[in-house]
Amino acid sequence: MALAIDDEIVTNDLAFDDEARIYVLTGPNRGGKSVITVALGAAQALTQLGLPVTATEAVISPVSAIFTHFPEGADDTIDKGRLGEECARLNDIFLKVTNRSLVLLDESLSSTGSFEASYIAAEVLGGLAHFGCRCLFSTHLHE
């Protein structure tokens, strides 16, 4: 059975190299940012397992680890609050990340105001740049 799609399919290209190791993907809520973030992680994992990916073309070099920071439920926020929980999970990533890692951040720091989130996000991205890892940070923040 063929799938009928009325809307035009939008393709995406990402190239991690010495010129660009960190991407910040912005846009409105429900604009597809999370889909791209998950698709990148899936393509990386599938390729490293020797499995095919859904792409016209894919050249993917191996990573030593894939770290994810996606919104979680409220279970761990009682003691620390949601921002504290997010920062604790970011700290866990920083303790393990290397220049051969892929870090996927999806709507990280959305538990606080845009000024504070932008400040913390800039520090996080600066730290990840220091490690030299590959990173995709999808956010609704525009600052």
Provide a role label for each language-model segment.
Residues 1-143:
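ATPase nucleotide-binding head domains, primarily ABC-like/P-loop NTPase cores
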